[in-house]
Amino acid sequence: MHFVKKNSEEKRKDLNDKLKSNKILRVPGAYNPLTAKVIEEIGYEAVYVSGGVMANDLGYPDIGLTTLKDVSYRSNQIARVTNLPTIVDVDTGFKSCEETIKTFEKCGIAAVHIEDQIEQKRCGHLDNKELISKEKMVDKIKNV
């Protein structure tokens, strides 16, 4: 049995300290709790939950079909089994960035990144992506 010793706040502080160190962080992706535990045992600095991998694991293409519930549930499963900070790709913020951030804070997530694409985003590797304006993205960030 794997017992986590660090709470969410400690994990967030760890990530903040690591980012301030200006060192390159090795942050491999985990698609389930077992993968996260392996990442920790190998000695990486954090765990990353990819939106594309999450979509594919659920049987969807990476075009914005996952829900806040889908991603937060799996991310919580991953974060609770490791002492490492977990960073999650929250696509375009699932309609309400403020609600998304609150949800992921409750899930024990250390950080998220939010896409700057229009709704019904597309995988970053695909053509024909449309970005929102710089002003809208700044507003998105300010609102959270």
Model region roles, listed by residue range:
Residues 18-22, 56-61, 84:
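Glycine/charged-rich beta-loop-alpha catalytic/anionic-binding loops adjacent to active sites
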Residues 21-25, 43-45, 82-86, 109-110:
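Short, well-ordered coil/turn segments that N-cap beta-strands
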